[in-house]
Amino acid sequence: MCGILFCSWKKKSQINKKIVHQSLNLLKNRGPDNSKLIFRENWSMGHTRLSIIDPNSKKSNQPFTDEEGRYFLTFNGEIYNYKKLKLNLVSRGFKFRTNSDTEVLYILLKNFTIESVLNLIKGMFAFVFFDKKENSFIAARDHFGQKPLYYSI
């Protein structure tokens, strides 16, 4: 069980960092092993981690991104078939730096349509995936809602 947070604003001047920090602090009981909050131009993403898969790797902490820094992922849950998906991706030439299901989900979302990703992954999950270049995000949860995803527009 982890906690995820994503906020966006029309203008940078609307950001209230104190409220965002307080919001993430409310989620700390969902993920006591690590907590991280990032702020960018007009958005913020946070995560509180309960380390189950790849527990000793700081590289698996979230929000998750790569060297390019275009995409960001905050994810709660477990992808049951991530090892099989990872083997398939490795056979296609994709490189990994962690042993986490988070990175598998990240690479899938970065390279394939959301529809195909949701059809491929099996598990319980909620996530937000942000594309910095397009200034757009995708929020999704598993089909049964085992992992909650609350949002407001």
Across the structure, where does each feature detected by a protein language model lie?
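N-terminus-centric sequence/structural signature that marks the extreme N-terminus
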Residues: 1-153
